[in-house]
Amino acid sequence: EMSASLVGSEMCIRDRYDNLHPSRIVVGRPRSGTATEADAHLFASLLQQGAAERDIPTLYPNATEAEAIKLFANTYLAVRVSYFNELDTYCELKGLDTRQIIDGVCLDPRIGAHYNNPSFGYGGYCLPKDTRQLVANFGDIPNRIISAAVTANDERKDHIARQILRKAAGGVVGVYRLTMKADSDNFRESSIRGVIERLRRAGASVVIYEPTLKAAAFDGLPVVASLAEFKRMAAVIVANRAESALDDVPEKVYTRDLYRRD
């Protein structure tokens, strides 16, 4: 007769880095069963041995609690992204210097100068999925802040699209990269794709520069292979994350990337 034990670990979103330098190890397991408890500790020890760090904080909650740790951690990050994006929206519309204000706010050590660079919204593999999942899990439980993160992310894309349309003034909108962040090839639920949807609904003419794409079109939109041609065609160049490749056309670029980092 065979028996099996099931354990699970929090998903890493930066696998190559987090496997070597984890901030914590969380191993979820069923609520009871000595074999499963032993298996959980064995699995954690394998992760500890494979890491470059030592004395890694390790938790052994039940499976539901382990999943909740992941969902609440990612939703907190989504809330923080949305907070600094709303700060930036306020400053942009009030004519204030966003960077001055963020720098001043983040000098408070309780807040810190991390995860504070404005963007077009959060996206990627985890944050959109996990925030929606957590809202669904709350059900009838009050959750103003959790739900607001999802709403704020949509409203940020609305604002960005309006600003782009105003700057383009009827000209061609060039989208520089589809990726969710710098040094990534991941398009999944990237914020720029949500902005593109809004631009298309408004009737804007949109072209894309994305060097990882080999096709001539993406989702029905032209993909321009030559960066020089892309710059020539676009009345405004939209970049969720600014790169040095655009430094020669600053007058065309619309970005909210103040620190050139994620």
Give each language-model segment a name.
Residues 3, 15-113:
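Internal alpha-helical scaffold of NAD(P)-dependent oxidoreductase catalytic cores
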Residues 174, 181-219:
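NAD(P)-binding Rossmann-fold cofactor-contacting core
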Residues 251-262:
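ADP-ribose/adenylate-binding Rossmann-like module
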